[in-house]
């Protein structure tokens, strides 16, 4: 039976938590559409009304 490598020392809570410090999720950034006030990602066509930069660019 083959032996596999195991940790020589127990990982401390501080080292474990420091490694996980970059794992947090960021909430999506949403802005209100100037035409219909629906929340949408910035710099994108509004999925509700189809407007972008004050012009109708998508038929909804």
Curated annotation (Swiss-Prot):
Region (Disordered): 1-28
GO CC terms, sorted: large ribosomal subunit
Gene Ontology biological-process annotations: translation
InterPro entries in alphabetical order: Ribosomal_bL32 (IPR002677), Ribosomal_bL32_bact (IPR044957), Ribosomal_zn-bd (IPR011332)
Signal peptide feature range: none
GO molecular function annotation: structural constituent of ribosome
Keywords: Ribonucleoprotein, Ribosomal protein
Keyword Ribosomal protein: yes
Compositionally biased tracts (Basic residues): 1-23
Pfam families named in the record: Ribosomal_L32p
Role, per record: Found on the solvent side of the large subunit.
Subunit composition and interactions: Part of the 50S ribosomal subunit.
Assigned protein family: Belongs to the bacterial ribosomal protein bL32 family.
Protein known as: Large ribosomal subunit protein bL32
The organism of origin for this protein: Thermus thermophilus (strain ATCC BAA-163 / DSM 7039 / HB27)
Species lineage: Bacteria, Thermotogati, Deinococcota, Deinococci, Thermales
Name of the coding gene: rpmF
